[in-house]
């Protein structure tokens, strides 16, 4: 074998066979002596299947960084049984490559059922319906950090395995919650999501928006900085006929994104967003902790937050004359990820969610695990009101149940359900805090709202409202 500057010994080539349902058999490798091009052949049975490939030397993956120049029937849904090929031109040296005496190259080809989607989905926004799948972030061709496309022209989504996981959403006990004027809106209650979903690894960037053919003014311009000053109406459309669960306006951000990818992207629901922001469930992922499992130690400047997020404590520089200059947002991915692998869930920009915002007392009905109020939240569903009717036709509190027309009255006496569009045009929820927020407003459990359309008044002049997208796995 040979690549640029390297000579490999063909006799050391081997191939592994990984059986699954569907199955892959007869994996072969060969290399063209002149071009150095490697051809990986395999036989697929039980199509359709999502096929992924990994290249290993000495039993260790070389990583996606070295697989940028790879093409063929992999990382996508393969619909036909039989022989398939993958072509790879290895043009970068890796750690083991120069040691020809010990060198041993292996291709591991995996096939998964079409309904068992891999953890990483990548949509190439430059082309129609160009969607790829990978086993993990480390498998991304060219490398997540080495290849700027993943934050400019491609959209990287990570699967959140939350189906049937019961967890406690909200908090009234952690630092930054107790004593806030709106702390009751964080009142703890149990939630169970009924579907897994993909969520953007990063906040949606300005370059990604431009790739969709859309432009808007940003407070802090930069290709890999997050979109800011983003109105809910720009995301979905301003007419009530475009409110969830209807399809968005074709000319909106989500309308353009759906048309380009063929996938039903949307904003995350609050429950989807918070589950991911908490870093999952379990020890160190509940009250009083950031999404990376470190404790919240302050409502103002928390060192555990400044280590993982662009926030007020690190978003300003002091000039020689004593004045301050705002650095604003950071390039997405500038700080470490949380425990589920997501970046900038705290700080940078506040992130829009689908849900309606009804003020500081949304949870005044004391929804707590102790009173048996367990909620099944359909992934992607938002604000169904469950409770006793009051004068303004609003329930006393919200459960994330199922926002669909004609949702029936509850079996319990005095219980009422209605969809979120009781309040068309109302404020929508934001989550996560921004570059200009203290620790109390960056907590995974903090909730607040902002006008669906207004982006040019008040704090929005500072460029604090952005978004990331979600995709429910049906």
Where are the model-predicted features located?
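Positively charged n-region of N-terminal signal peptides that target proteins for export
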Residues: 1-4
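Short, compositionally biased
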Residues: 6, 12, 19-22, 43, ...
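Short, compositionally biased P/S/T/A/G/V-rich stretches that sit at domain boundaries
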Residues: 20-33
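Structural beta-strand segments of beta-rich domains
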Residues: 36-40
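Short solvent-exposed strand-capping/beta-turn motif centered on an Asx-Ser/Thr pair
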Residues: 45-47
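Solvent-exposed serine/threonine-rich low-complexity stretches and specific carbohydrate-binding patches
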Residues: 63-78
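Signal that preferentially marks extracellular ectodomain short beta-strand elements
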Residues: 74-75, 83-99
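Functional-site microenvironments in short loops/helix caps that host divalent-cation chemistry
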Residues: 221, 229-444
């Amino acid at each position: 074998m040979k690549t640029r500057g390297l000579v490999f010994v063909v006799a050391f080539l081997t191939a592994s066979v990984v059986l699954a349902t569907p199955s892959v058999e007869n994996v072969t490798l060969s290399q063209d002596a002149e071009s150095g091009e490697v051809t990986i052949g395999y036989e697929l049975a039980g199509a359709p299947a999502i096929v992924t490939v990994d290249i290993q030397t000495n039993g260790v993956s070389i990583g996606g960084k070295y697989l940028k120049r790879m093409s063929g029937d992999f990382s996508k849904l393969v619909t036909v049984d039989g022989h398939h090929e993958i072509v790879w031109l290895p043009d970068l040296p890796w750690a083991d490559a120069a040691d020809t005496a010990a060198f041993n190259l292996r291709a591991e080809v995996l096939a998964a059922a079409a309904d068992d989607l891999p953890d990483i989905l990548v949509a190439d926004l430059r082309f129609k319906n160009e969607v790829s799948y990978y086993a993990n972030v480390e498998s991304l061709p060219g490398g997540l950090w080495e290849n700027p496309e993943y934050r400019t022209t491609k959209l990287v989504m990570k699967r959140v395995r939350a189906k049937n996981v019961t967890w406690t959403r909200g908090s009234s006990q952690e630092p930054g919650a107790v004593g806030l004027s709106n702390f009751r809106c964080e009142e703890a209650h149990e939630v169970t999501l009924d579907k897994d979903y993909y969520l953007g690894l990063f906040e949606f960037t300005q370059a990604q928006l431009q790739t969709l053919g859309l432009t808007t003014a940003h407070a802090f311009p930069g290709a890999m900085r997050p979109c800011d000053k983003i109105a809910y109406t720009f995301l979905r459309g301003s007419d009530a006929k475009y409110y969830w669960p209807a399809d968005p306006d074709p000319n909106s951000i989500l309308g353009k994104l759906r048309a380009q990818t063929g996938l039903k992207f949307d904003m995350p629901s609050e429950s989807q967003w918070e589950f991911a922001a908490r870093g999952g469930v379990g020890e160190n992922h509940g009250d009083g902790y950031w999404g990376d499992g470190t404790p919240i130690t302050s409502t103002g400047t928390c060192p555990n937050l400044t280590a993982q997020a662009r926030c007020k404590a690190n978003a300003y520089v002091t000039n020689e004359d004593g004045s301050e200059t705002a650095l604003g947002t950071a390039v997405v991915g500038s700080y470490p990820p949380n425990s589920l692998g997501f970046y900038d869930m705290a700080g940078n920009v506040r992130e829009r969610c689908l849900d309606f915002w009804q003020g500081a007392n949304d949870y005044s009905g004391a929804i707590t695990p102790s009173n048996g109020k367990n909620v099944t939240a359909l992934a992607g569903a938002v604000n169904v009101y469950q409770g006793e009717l009051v004068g303004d036709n609003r329930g006393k509190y919200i459960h994330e149940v199922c926002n669909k027309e004609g949702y029936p009255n509850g079996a319990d006496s005095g219980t009422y359900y209605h969809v979120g569009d009781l309040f068309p045009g109302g404020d929508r929820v934001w989550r996560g805090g921004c570059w200009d927020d203290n620790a109390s407003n960056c907590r995974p459990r903090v909730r607040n709202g902002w006008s669906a359309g207004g982006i040019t008044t008040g704090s929005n002049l500072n460029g604090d409202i952005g978004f990331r997208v979600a995709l429910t796995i049906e």
